């Protein structure tokens, strides 16, 4: 009777707690120095081949930009980031790929939670390449949180805005704490989140609500970029 009871309890544990028996791979770890760029064609789902493997030294050798970014979060607050690295389009060119041939960009990260191909984020190429995005240095003190995925720039929020390129940051620092966001500076950058996508916010209108959540697209721990090309 006792043996049957123990066997039953063990069966319940296996059914209800598979992670105890078959643990999943741990994610959210530093990605490493090498960036793997793979390419595939539209309509060939999941079929990607390695085009280039770029070392940290190769990425450092590309023209560098140090930029500041402000992005709205999913809870309607503002995240501030400072990052240094090459422009994303330069990284793609360094891999021997014509920017004009790229339809979709997929970021592979160790923070992907086990998704297919470790994709954290995928987007149309023209969203961050060739588009105009902005940094708003005065938005922290002039921003109204309206709810989840909703906020509004107040008077003065758009003053001093500047266009920023999308970069693949080798070193960066970000914060969602308003008091820290106002004091953010380049000396705070480190490589803990590398490689990280840093992109600006879309064009905002003073006094007009926006639901453009861009902070969750600031992927970190990127170890690979998959590019879906036009054609076949």
What are these regions (language model features)?
Residues 1-4:
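Positively charged n-region of N-terminal signal peptides that target proteins for export
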Residues 10-18:
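Hydrophobic core
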Residues 19-23:
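Juxtamembrane cytosolic interface motif at the C-terminal end of transmembrane helices
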Residues 24-232:
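N-terminal intrinsically disordered, low-complexity segments enriched in P/E/S/T
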């Amino acid at each position: 009777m006792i043996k049957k009871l123990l066997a039953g309890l063990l069966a319940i544990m296996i059914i209800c707690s598979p992670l105890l028996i078959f643990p999943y791979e741990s994610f959210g770890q530093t990605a490493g120095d090498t960036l793997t760029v793979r390419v595939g064609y539209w309509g060939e789902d999941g079929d990607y081949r390695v085009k280039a493997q770029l070392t940290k030294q190769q990425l450092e050798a590309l023209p560098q930009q140090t930029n500041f970014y402000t992005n709205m979060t999913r809870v309607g607050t503002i995240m501030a980031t400072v990052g240094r690295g090459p422009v994303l389009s330069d990284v793609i060119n360094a891999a021997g790929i014509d920017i004009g041939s790229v339809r979709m960009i997929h970021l592979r990260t160790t923070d992907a939670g086990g998704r297919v191909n470790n994709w954290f984020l995928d987007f149309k190429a023209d969203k961050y390449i060739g588009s105009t995005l902005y940094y708003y240095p005065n938005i922290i003190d002039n921003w109204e949180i309206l709810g989840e995925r909703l906020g509004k720039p107040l008077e003065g929020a758009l003053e001093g805005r500047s266009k920023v390129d999308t970069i693949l940051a080798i070193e960066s620092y970000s914060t969602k704490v308003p008091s820290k966001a106002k004091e953010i500076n380049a000396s705070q950058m480190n490589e803990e989140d590398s490689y990280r996508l840093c992109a600006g916010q879309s064009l905002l209108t003073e006094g007009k609500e926006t639901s453009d959540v861009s902070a969750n697209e600031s992927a970190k721990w990127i170890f690979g970029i998959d590019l879906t090309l036009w054609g076949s």
